[in-house]
Design a protein with these regions (language model features):
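Membrane-embedded alpha-helical bundles that constitute the cytochrome b-like, heme-associated redox core
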Residues: 1-210
Length: 211
């Protein structure tokens, strides 16, 4: 099994083609293993008493945050469907749908970053040294977000930004309603972009499975 794939450019030189999609099956297999192990752990775990519904209700997420979450989720799933299915042999006209979903994802992520910086407590979701002790010390109580939630957010943030940046570079090179296809990047450079896009996509599939 290969991690990366190579090809010969127009001069016969070996250049990167991108990530090997053999890794997709590894990610899928590991995801199923994790889900199965998690299900077993939850089945045998001692269930704690459910908290009372008495008292004031805590408003954890504003409507705009829930809307952002679902628009982002739908965009990512459309990107995965249109990006992965053609790789495994399901042929359909996918490219236009793919880049439209990519632009939607980019727009909602930029909106979320701006809103987080100026209208929310930006640092409340980021992992701090204190948070790392939380899983090992029952006396440490999480705030609004637990260590697991903060870690998941950090992973999704890094991977999503990698997918977006590499995707925008590729988008700038294809035919669109606004510009024609260009060969501005060498095949070697483009191979590194494909590699970054492919590996971050595969990692995002794994993280979504954990989520």
């Amino acid at each position: 099994m290969d991690i990366v794939e190579y090809k010969s450019d127009v001069w016969g030189r070996e250049v990167l083609l991108g990530a090997s999609w053999d890794l997709l099956w590894v990610v899928i297999a590991l995801s199923f293993v994790f889900i199965a192990v998690h299900a077993v752990i939850m089945a045998v775990r001692k269930r704690e008493a459910k908290p009372s519904s008495d008292g004031p209700k805590v408003h954890r997420h504003a409507a705009i945050d829930r809307l952002f979450h679902w628009v982002m989720a739908i965009a990512i799933f459309v990107l995965l469907i249109t990006g992965v299915l053609p790789i495994i042999g399901v042929e359909f006209s996918w490219l236009t749908i793919h880049w439209i979903a990519g632009l939607v994802l980019t727009a909602v992520v930029v909106f979320h970053i701006v809103r987080s910086l100026f209208w929310q407590d930006f640092m409340s979701i980021w992992v701090t040294p204190k948070d790392i002790k939380e899983p090992f010390d029952d006396s440490i109580k999480p705030g609004k977000y637990s260590f697991a939630q903060k870690s998941m957010h950090a992973a999704v943030t890094v991977l999503t930004l990698l997918v977006i940046v590499s995707g925008l570079v590729m988008f700038a090179l294809i035919d669109t309603p606004w510009w024609d296809r260009t060969n501005a990047l060498s095949e070697a450079t483009l191979g590194w972009i494909f590699l970054a896009h492919g590996l971050s996509t595969l990692a995002l599939i794994g993280v979504i499975s954990l989520h």
